[in-house]
């Protein structure tokens, strides 16, 4: 089960999995991967990259990319970079 259940002003529910990493890899349990594979729509993963070499501290990925994200880590292209862009993206869901 994801960490957050959100609801925006457009009447759309969405879920968010939160991850923190000091490197480029993200760790997912088999249950987390299965959830995102089973529910690929309106599910998202937000990763916070820590450390002095973190270029884009907050990155958001679609849940449908969880298998690739587990394999490639933060090398995978994010759908949003930065908290402002993430907020705006989630706010616009269903518009």
Role assignments for model-derived ranges:
Residues 4-6, 11-22:
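Conserved catalytic cores of phosphodiester-cleaving nucleases, focusing on short active-site segments
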Residues 5, 19, 50, 70, ...:
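Intrinsically disordered, low-complexity regions of eukaryotic proteins
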Residues 21-40:
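Mg2+/Mn2+-dependent nuclease catalytic core
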Residues 36-41, 79, 83:
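Short, surface-exposed loop and linker segments with low hydrophobicity and enrichment for Pro/Ser/Thr
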Residues 37-65:
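Nucleic-acid nuclease catalytic cores
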Residues 51-53, 67, 82, 86:
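Basic, glycine-rich
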Residues 71-95:
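Charged phosphate-binding loop/patch that engages nucleotide di/tri-phosphates or the phosphate backbone
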């Amino acid at each position: 089960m994801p960490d957050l259940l959100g609801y925006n002003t457009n009447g759309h529910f969405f879920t968010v999995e939160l991850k923190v990493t000091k490197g480029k890899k993200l760790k997912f349990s088999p249950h987390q991967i299965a959830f995102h594979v089973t529910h690929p729509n309106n599910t998202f993963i937000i990763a916070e990259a820590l450390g002095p070499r973190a270029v884009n501290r907050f990155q958001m990925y679609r849940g449908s990319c969880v298998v690739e994200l587990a394999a490639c880590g933060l090398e995978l292209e994010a759908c949003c970079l930065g908290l402002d862009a993430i907020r705006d993206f989630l706010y616009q869901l269903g518009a």
